[in-house]
């Protein structure tokens, strides 16, 4: 689930950073048009040199922001290659996440039942309990049984002492061993096993605490991101209307160039905040599913089998008893990325569903 979470995170990052690059490119284009218009109006004395300087300043800052956004997109695409093994091309829009809980209590209840870390510590605790029983058994009596038989055939033997042509012999018995004194070894082993069982119990409690905290935190982040999406969507709509109004008022002479520049910056910031909130909500939702133990392919409705099957190799080797039945020389399975082209700031296209 950890690796899958990393892939989901970088996948959404590519989408987010591509959108931010697109917004910044649109902003640069708009500011270039605004600068040309300001320069033309300055030539006819409609605006001052200060207005032109403000337009130039905002354009320079916008170009710097665009360069930073493009660098971030390239970084996300390279991290995508490092995790997936291929460049992001024609990415599909991420599907809705299934099985998200209605409350933090229900999320914690599922996590305590299905989280693999909790299940692992429970198995370790049970194994430690059996180790204690094995250690205490060192001081208990032992009973063993034995059976043996033999058959000898002296047919055609020339030995005069042999009176019977064959001889059959069978032996059976039982043996009980009662340890009287072993130098304190059984007690020491038992105390050691009890200490390890105590450690396993505390580790299980620690894992449970950690998973509860992770689940509640992920739920809170997910809900906060959803609320942020609603707020920023309203902000995007409001800033778009505000920008149109400021431009109209500027044409009427009641607004300055600086007012337009500020309105455009606010509109850009709102759109960037929206795609960031959408990214955060998706990542937080997947993190919540992972904390609940529901980040497997079967939970996500992915028809690709389990992300990891721990019994595949066991089934492959469980019937092999030959001493020289070795495995073949291992070969690379992961994709080599040496031949992958260096990524650019080109926005990956979105695949059609």
What feature does the model see in each segment?
Residues 93-101, 133, 146-189, 298-353:
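Small/polar, glycine/serine/threonine/aspartate-rich low-complexity segments that form flexible
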Residues 117, 128, 141:
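Extended ligand-binding clefts on enzyme/binding-domain cores
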Residues 2-112, 221, 225, 245-248, ...:
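Periplasmic alpha-helical coiled-coil/stalk elements that build and connect Gram-negative outer-membrane
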Residues 1-3, 25, 50, 54, ...:
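Sec/SRP-type N-terminal targeting helices
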Residues 117-118, 271:
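Extended amphipathic alpha-helical heptad-repeat regions
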Residues 264-319:
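A contiguous, mid-protein "functional segment" used to position or interact
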Residues 121, 143-147:
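Membrane-embedded beta-strand positions of outer-membrane beta-barrel proteins
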């Amino acid at each position: 689930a950890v690796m899958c979470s990393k892939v989901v995170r970088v996948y959404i990052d590519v989408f987010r950073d591509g959108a931010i690059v697109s917004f910044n490119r649109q902003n640069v284009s708009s500011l270039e048009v605004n600068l040309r218009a300001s320069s033309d109006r300055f030539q006819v004395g409609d605006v001052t040199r200060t207005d032109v300087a403000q337009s130039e300043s905002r354009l320079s800052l916008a170009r710097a922001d665009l360069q930073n956004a493009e660098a971030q997109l390239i970084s996300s695409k390279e991290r995508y290659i490092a995790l997936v093994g291929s460049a992001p091309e024609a990415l599909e829009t991420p599907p809705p996440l299934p099985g998200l809980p209605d409350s933090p209590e229900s999320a914690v209840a599922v996590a305590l039942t299905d989280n693999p870390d909790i299940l692992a510590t429970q198995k370790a605790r049970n194994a430690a309990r059996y180790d204690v029983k094995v250690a205490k058994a060192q001081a208990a009596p032992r009973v063993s049984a034995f059976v043996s038989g033999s058959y000898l055939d002296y047919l055609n033997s020339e030995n005069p002492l042999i009176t019977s042509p064959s001889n059959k012999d069978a032996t059976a018995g039982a043996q009980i061993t009662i340890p009287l004194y072993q130098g304190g070894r059984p007690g020491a082993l038992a105390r050691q096993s009890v200490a390890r069982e105590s450690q396993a119990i505390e580790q299980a409690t620690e894992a449970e605490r950690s998973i509860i905290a992770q689940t509640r935190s992920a739920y809170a982040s997910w809900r906060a991101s959803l609320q942020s999406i609603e707020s920023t969507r309203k902000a995007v709509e409001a800033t778009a209307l505000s920008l149109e109004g400021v431009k109209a008022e500027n044409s009427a002479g009641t607004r300055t160039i600086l007012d337009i520049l500020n309105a455009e910056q606010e509109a850009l910031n709102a759109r960037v905040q929206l795609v960031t909130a959408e990214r955060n909500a998706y990542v937080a939702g997947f993190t919540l599913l992972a904390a609940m133990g529901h980040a497997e392919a079967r939970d996500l409705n992915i028809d690709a089998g389990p992300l990891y099957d721990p019994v595949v190799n066991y089934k492959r080797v469980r019937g092999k008893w030959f001493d020289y039945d070795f495995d073949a020389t291992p070969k690379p399975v992961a994709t080599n990325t040496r031949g992958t082209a260096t990524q650019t700031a080109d926005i990956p296209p979105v695949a059609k569903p």
